[in-house]
Structure formats: structure tokens, C-alpha cells
Amino acid sequence: MSDPEPLPDHVARNRAYWDEINAPLYAAPGRRSWARDDITWGIFGVPETDLRALPDVEGKDVIELGCGTAYVSAWLARGGARVTGVDSSEEPLKTARALQDKHDLHVPLIHGNAEAVPLPDASFDLAVSEYGASIWADPYRWIPEAARLLRPGGELVFLVNGTLWVLTVPDTDAEGPAAERLLRPYFGMHRFEWPDEPGVEFHLGYGDWIRLLRANGFEVLDLIEIQAPPEAKGGRFDLVDPEWARKWPAEQIWRARRT
């Protein structure tokens, strides 16, 4: 499916970036996640049964915004949901389609921009993003789009990097994981361009998230700050030390309801 209009710069850059890094970094984790039935969250794989971030999805229409290899879509489909996945990058979707064939579990996958999804208003009961649109799309564009796609009473659940992690992680991977001191300002958080990566990330402070959600007709239900479990030995890509993540939240899940 082609994009209806020229892509914003950050969307085009992130599309090219993810097309490049999918195979070496994310295809194998995607295969492992597809092979599991249990839903887990984040870099330490904390079980959904512990966090209770999701509503009952059986019989619900669900959209995953920034689905990547679509393992979250697969988990939700196995739970009885009617799922549609959207991703800006074609390479992760190729992996997703191959895994759909392997596991004989197929959901619609759209190659498109999560900030401008080519689907009708009020089509879904739940919108989910697990490090997809939630950090790779501009929240001032994708949150209004999620609101448009959801029916009244529908829920939005999305996972992002913890605010403290964003403030304490060094500029480059070579400098190591998150530190125990602040490295950048909290106020004015929005667009992040790391020196060693060509992509563009987006992170907001707590107040900005709350105001943005409310401005788009959402009631904030919960903010789940994920703590690394005692048995955690390491996370994906060494972004954070487990001991750090046992003291401060490296990840957080927002839950909101469309009013």
C-alpha cells in the first residue's frame, strides 16, 4: 500500500533506518517472540500476567501501531482479537509475513505511516504500540491518529523508554548503558537524534504526555513503571544494567481510554 502523501522527514528517515537494521538486529528476536504464546513486555520480558497492562482482547478489534515483525499482533490474535498491524518499514513486514506463514496465523499487515493510517474512523477497540509508533513517530501526530481510529471507550496501551532512562543514557552506545546522573534536561523533551544513529526518536515528559492524551479525548488510566525482575541478567542491546533497572524504571507503559 502506497503512502497517500509525501512522508515527513522523520518518517522517511526512520523507514530507511528500520529497513536497514531489521535483519541483523530484530528478525531473530521476532522469530523467538512468535514462537511463544505468553505476552511479555520490554527488554527484560516481564510477563503480562504480572503487569496487567492489557484489557481482555477476545472478540475485540485491535490495531498495532508500528508492529515491526508483528509478534505482539500474533500474541493478541492468539488471545482471540481481530488484529491489524501497521508499520512504516517494509523489511520488518517481510519477516512478519514469513512468520505468519510458518505459524499459520495471519492478520492484515499495512505498510504505512502510523501518523496517517489509511483506515476509517472508529474502527478499533484497542490500539497498542510496543516501542513502535510510541517512540518512532511524533506523539503530536500519532496520538491524535490513535484517537481517531478508536471507538468511544476504546483503550490505548503503549510502551516507551522510561523518562529517567532517557535523561541518563549516554549519547552513544560506546559510552555504555544508563548512568546514575542526569545527562540532559527534562524540560523541552520531544525529538531526539542520537549521534551514532540515523533515526529519529520521540520522548516526552510526564506532564506533556498527560496533557497530550487529555487534549485528544483520552482519560489516563494507569502509568506502569516496569522494574527489572530479581532474576534479570541483562536486556536487549545492553541499553540498561539490570541493577539500574531494579532501582529506577527503564521502561513505562501508558494506559488510556478514549472518552
Predicted features along the sequence, with ranges:
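A short SAM/SAH-binding and catalytic strip from SAM-dependent methyltransferases
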Residues: 126-140
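A short glycine-rich, Lys/Arg-flanked "PGG" loop and its adjoining helix->strand segment in the class I
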Residues: 140-155
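Short alpha-helix
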Residues: 200-223
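Class I SAM-dependent methyltransferase SAM/SAH-binding core
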Residues: 61-116
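Conserved alpha-helix/loop element of class I SAM-dependent methyltransferases that forms part
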Residues: 31-60
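A short acidic, Gly/Pro-enriched loop at the edge of an enzyme's catalytic core
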Residues: 115-126
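Conserved class I S-adenosyl-L-methionine
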Residues: 155-190
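N-terminal, positively charged/glycine-rich alpha-helical extensions of SAM-dependent methyltransferases
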Residues: 1-35
